[in-house]
C-alpha cells in the first residue's frame, strides 16, 4: 500500500513553517492518541502516520530530501537515507500533549501524588452586606482523606503489592512508530503499587465525600464576581498530594431601591408635580440612613442630584463613591373636581406664554419647521 504524502497527512501546505507543522502535528496527536482511543486500530495507525510525517518534515535535511525525492528520499526500504530519531525534537510537543492527558508533565513523576481539585462556592449577599462587609458560615461538599486508611486506600494492616504492569516503576514505555514515549502507568497511576485489599470505608479511593462547614469573612466593598480564596479548603489530594483551594465567588442580589455601578449607587426619586414646579425639600434613603435633598423650582424629570460620599468604598481601597438620585416627576391622577378646576385655570394662564415651557416651545417650533420644509 502506497504511503500518503507527508504534507497531506499533517494537512498543511508544502511551504508550511515549523510553527505550522508543530501546530498541525499536535492537533492530530491529541485527536488520535491511543489513550484517547483505546482499542481503535484506525486511530492508532493515524497516530503513527502523523508521527512519521512530523519526524521527517520537522528535520530540515530530511524535509529537503522528501521534497526532492518523495518517500524514496527518506525511507530506507526504498533506498533512501532512513528516518530515525535524527534531528526531530518531540520533547516540547509531547510536554504539551501529555499535560493535557495526564494533568501536567509526561508521566506525572514517580509516586503519582496529585493536588486536590479547587472548589467554587457561590455566596449570595444583599447590597448592605456587600457594602459593609460581613462574616457568614457556609457548608461545602468536598472530598477529604479517609480516616480509617489515612488516605492510602488500603485496608488497615494490609500491604499493597507491586504493580505487574510497570514492575513498580510507576511508568511504562510505549512504542509509537519510530520512537518510544514514557508515560504514567495506566494501572497503578504512577504509584508503582496496586491495592489488593482495599479499605472498606473508601473502597480503595483514599478519599470520602463530606460536608465541611467554614466561616468566611467578607470584606467591605465586594461586588458580584469578586472571589475570596480559602487556601487549603478544597478537595484533599491523592496519594499524599496537597489539598486544593476553595474560591468563594460573590453574587450580590438586586436591591429594591439602589442600583450599583462600581463604587457609585443610583436610585430614582419620584417627586410631585407641584414640588417640581415650586421647589421643595424631601428625604431620600442612603445606606447610612435618610438625608434631606433640596429640590429647586422648575426641576424636570431626569434631573440628577449627586450626594457625594454616599456610595460604596471599594474593597481594594480608595474613597467612597457617590449616590446619584434621578428625579421622576409624577403626573397627578384621580383628581377631584376642584383640583381639575385649578389645573385648568393654570393651563389657561400659561396659554401662549412659552417662557414657562421652553423645551416644549422649542420642540413645537421644530415640528413646524419640519412640516414647512416638506
UniProtKB/Swiss-Prot annotation:
Co-factor binding details: Binds 2 Zn(2+) ions per monomer.
Zinc finger regions, CR-type: 133-211
Subcellular location: Cytoplasm
Subunit structure: Homodimer.
Record domain J: where: 5-70
Cofactor(s) needed by this chain: Zn(2+)
Main localization category: cytoplasm
Alphabetic keyword roster: Chaperone, Cytoplasm, DNA replication, Metal-binding, Repeat, Stress response, Zinc, Zinc-finger
Molecular functions (GO terms): ATP binding; heat shock protein binding; unfolded protein binding; zinc ion binding
Protein's recorded name: Chaperone protein DnaJ
Segments annotated as CXXCXGXG motif repeats: 146-153, 163-170, 185-192, 199-206
Organism: Pseudomonas putida (strain ATCC 700007 / DSM 6899 / JCM 31910 / BCRC 17059 / LMG 24140 / F1)
Lineage, highest ranks first: Bacteria, Pseudomonadati, Pseudomonadota, Gammaproteobacteria, Pseudomonadales
GO biological process, any: protein refolding
Family: Belongs to the DnaJ family.
Any single Gene Ontology cellular-component annotation: cytoplasm
Binding residues for Zn(2+) 1: 146, 149, 199, 202
Pfam families for this protein: DnaJ, DnaJ_C, DnaJ_CXXCXGXG
Binding site for Zn(2+) 2: 163, 166, 185, 188
Function text: Participates actively in the response to hyperosmotic and heat shock by preventing the aggregation of stress-denatured proteins and by disaggregating proteins, also in an autonomous, DnaK-independent fashion. Unfolded proteins bind initially to DnaJ; upon interaction with the DnaJ-bound protein, DnaK hydrolyzes its bound ATP, resulting in the formation of a stable complex. GrpE releases ADP from DnaK; ATP binding to DnaK triggers the release of the substrate protein, thus completing the reaction cycle.
HAMAP family from the UniProt entry: DnaJ
The record's note on its domains: The J domain is necessary and sufficient to stimulate DnaK ATPase activity. Zinc center 1 plays an important role in the autonomous, DnaK-independent chaperone activity of DnaJ. Zinc center 2 is essential for interaction with DnaK and for DnaJ activity.
Amino acid at each position: 500500500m502506497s504511503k500518503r504524502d507527508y504534507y497531506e497527512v499533517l494537512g498543511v501546505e508544502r511551504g508550511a513553517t515549523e510553527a505550522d507543522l508543530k501546530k498541525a502535528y499536535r492537533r492530530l496527536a491529541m485527536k488520535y492518541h491511543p489513550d484517547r482511543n483505546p482499542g481503535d486500530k484506525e486511530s492508532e495507525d493515524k497516530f503513527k502516520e502523523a508521527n512519521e510525517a512530523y519526524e521527517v518534515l520537522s528535520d530540515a535535511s530530511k524535509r529537503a530530501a522528501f521534497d526532492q525525492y518523495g518517500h524514496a528520499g527518506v525511507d530506507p526500504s526504498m533506498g533512501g537515507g532512513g528516518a530515525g530519531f535524527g534531528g526531530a525534537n518531540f520533547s516540547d510537543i509531547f510536554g504539551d500533549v501529555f499535560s493535557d492527558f495526564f494533568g501536567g508533565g509526561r508521566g506525572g513523576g514517580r509516586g503519582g501524588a496529585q493536588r486536590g481539585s479547587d472548589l467554587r462556592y457561590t455566596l449570595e449577599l444583599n447590597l448592605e452586606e456587600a457594602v459593609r462587609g460581613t462574616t457568614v458560615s457556609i457548608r461545602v461538599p468536598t472530598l477529604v482523606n479517609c480516616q480509617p486508611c489515612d488516605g492510602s486506600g488500603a485496608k488497615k494492616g494490609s500491604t499493597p503489592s507491586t504493580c505487574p504492569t510497570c514492575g513498580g516503576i510507576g511508568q511504562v514505555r510505549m512504542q509509537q512508530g519510530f520512537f518510544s514515549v514514557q508515560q504514567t502507568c495506566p494501572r497503578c497511576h504512577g504509584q508503582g503499587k496496586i491495592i489488593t485489599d482495599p479499605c472498606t470505608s473508601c473502597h480503595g479511593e483514599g478519599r470520602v465525600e463530606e460536608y465541611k462547614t467554614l466561616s468566611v469573612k467578607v470584606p467591605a466593598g465586594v461586588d458580584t464576581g469578586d472571589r475570596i480564596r480559602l487556601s487549603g479548603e478544597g478537595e484533599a489530594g491523592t496519594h499524599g498530594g496537597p489539598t486544593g483551594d476553595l474560591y468563594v465567588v460573590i453574587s450580590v442580589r438586586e436591591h429594591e431601591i439602589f442600583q450599583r455601578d462600581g463604587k457609585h449607587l443610583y436610585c430614582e426619586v419620584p417627586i410631585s408635580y407641584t414640588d417640581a414646579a415650586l421647589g421643595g425639600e424631601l428625604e431620600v434613603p442612603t445606606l447610612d440612613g435618610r438625608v434631606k435633598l433640596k429640590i429647586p423650582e422648575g426641576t424636570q424629570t431626569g434631573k440628577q442630584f449627586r450626594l457625594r460620599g454616599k456610595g460604596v468604598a471599594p474593597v481594594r481601597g480608595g474613597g467612597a463613591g457617590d449616590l446619584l438620585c434621578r428625579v421622576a416627576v409624577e403626573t397627578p391622577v384621580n383628581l377631584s373636581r376642584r383640583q381639575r378646576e385649578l389645573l385648568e385655570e393654570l393651563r389657561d394662564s400659561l396659554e401662549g406664554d412659552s417662557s414657562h415651557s421652553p423645551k416644549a416651545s422649542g420642540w413645537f417650533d421644530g415640528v413646524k419647521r419640519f412640516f414647512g420644509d416638506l
